[in-house]
């Protein structure tokens, strides 16, 4: 609840989280694309372009709560693995952006012309971490309604948690559509993030 959830924040931040002060731009974009009276979302697109051009991938490393969560997990002492040999997986996030965020909510609609937020509903682990788990802990009605989708999302979250311990921010690198947008805009951003060596 709250009026602040009508305003996007620059990181992956599920609006269903009880403590969320703002909306996730990916979730907000899917809500507009999947609405029965779809109109191009100038606000969300403009917001993403503005923060992407100003800050680029800086956002992913310093302002995204899910990126920070993965970084904390990576600090757990264990053998680490490089993602260099897995570089082709970085292109998955662009497929997720085009397919699950842009096309599927607009094209796969129900009888009243509304599409599901496919990325948020079926893939995003942030929603189950910030929203579903905390809400189900305090509301028995929500606990009673949990089913196969919750189990699926928890499995994705568990996979990301395990991978984050051994790989550096795997979800950000391989699946995050917000990271895909910021990676594209990083080439023209004022704060370009580059790896020296």
Regions found by a protein language model. Name each.
Residues 1-197:
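Non-ligating segments of multi-cofactor redox enzymes
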């Amino acid at each position: 609840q709250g009026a602040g959830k009508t305003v996007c924040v620059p990181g992956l931040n599920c609006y269903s989280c009880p403590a969320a002060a703002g909306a996730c731009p990916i979730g907000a974009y899917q809500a507009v694309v999947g609405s029965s009276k779809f109109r191009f979302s100038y606000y969300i697109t403009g917001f993403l372009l503005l923060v992407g051009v100003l800050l680029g991938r800086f956002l992913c490393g310093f302002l995204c709560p899910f990126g920070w969560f993965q970084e904390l997990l990576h600090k757990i002492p264990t053998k680490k693995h490089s993602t260099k040999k897995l570089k082709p997986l970085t292109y998955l996030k662009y497929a997720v952006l085009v397919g699950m965020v842009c096309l599927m909510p607009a094209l796969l609609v129900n009888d009243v012309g509304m599409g599901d937020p496919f990325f948020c509903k079926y893939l995003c682990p942030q929603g189950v971490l910030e929203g579903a788990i905390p809400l189900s802990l305090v509301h028995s009605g929500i606990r009673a309604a949990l089913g196969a989708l919750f189990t699926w999302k928890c499995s994705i979250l568990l996979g990301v948690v395990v991978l984050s311990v051994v790989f550096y921010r795997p979800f950000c690198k391989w699946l995050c559509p917000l990271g895909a947008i910021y990676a594209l805009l990083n080439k023209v951003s004022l704060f370009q993030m580059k790896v020296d060596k």
